[in-house]
Amino acid sequence: MDEEEIKYFVRVRNTDLDGTKAVHIALTGIKGIGPHTSRTITALAAVDPHAILGKLDDESVGRIANAVDTYTEQVPDWMVNRQKDVYTGEVRHLLGTDLTMMNDDDVNRMRKMRSYRGIRHETGQKVRGQRTKSTGRTGTTVGVKRKKD
């Protein structure tokens, strides 16, 4: 294919992907798909991960889109990002705005039940047990001032 025939934007799962990048790198532009997941999707779609996304034909892009949509059914449960939904108990792989909304719902649920993690989220402190004595300070600078002679 010539340089003029490249598609600079390829739309997959309501996201514009960069057509000038390799398939496995371009797929990471979708929120919820990282490097490992993108490699798995290219293997499921039977597409070369190092091929340029904009140079693929429509049939290959369709296979990639289908692999993204059916990712949950084709991989083991430990490879998805929502292994046991709190409300429904089902195994799902969330992408895009669904992932953002579900994350916000989880944080709001923790705040509402007043769990330790919810309170830490509310107050803007570190949640996962990191040290807070010397790092993560915001606001005024804390330090020792030298006495001027």
From Swiss-Prot:
Pfam families: Ribosomal_S13. InterPro entries: Rbsml_uS13_C, Ribosomal_uS13, Ribosomal_uS13-like_H2TH, Ribosomal_uS13_archaeal, Ribosomal_uS13_CS. One of its GO terms (molecular function) is structural constituent of ribosome. Residues 122-149 are annotated as: Disordered. One of its GO terms (cellular component) is cytosol. Keywords: Ribonucleoprotein, Ribosomal protein, RNA-binding, rRNA-binding. The keyword Cell membrane does not apply. Residues 132-143 have a biased composition (Low complexity). The keyword Hydrolase does not apply. Coiled coil: none annotated. GO terms for biological process: translation. Part of the 30S ribosomal subunit. Forms a loose heterodimer with protein S19. Forms two bridges to the 50S subunit in the 70S ribosome. NCBIfam families: PRK04053.1, uS13_arch. Belongs to the universal ribosomal protein uS13 family. Located at the top of the head of the 30S subunit, it contacts several helices of the 16S rRNA. In the 70S ribosome it contacts the 23S rRNA (bridge B1a) and protein L5 of the 50S subunit (bridge B1b), connecting the 2 subunits; these bridges are implicated in subunit movement. This is Small ribosomal subunit protein uS13. It comes from Methanoculleus marisnigri (strain ATCC 35101 / DSM 1498 / JR1). The lineage of its organism: Archaea, Methanobacteriati, Methanobacteriota, Stenosarchaea group, Methanomicrobia. The gene is rps13.
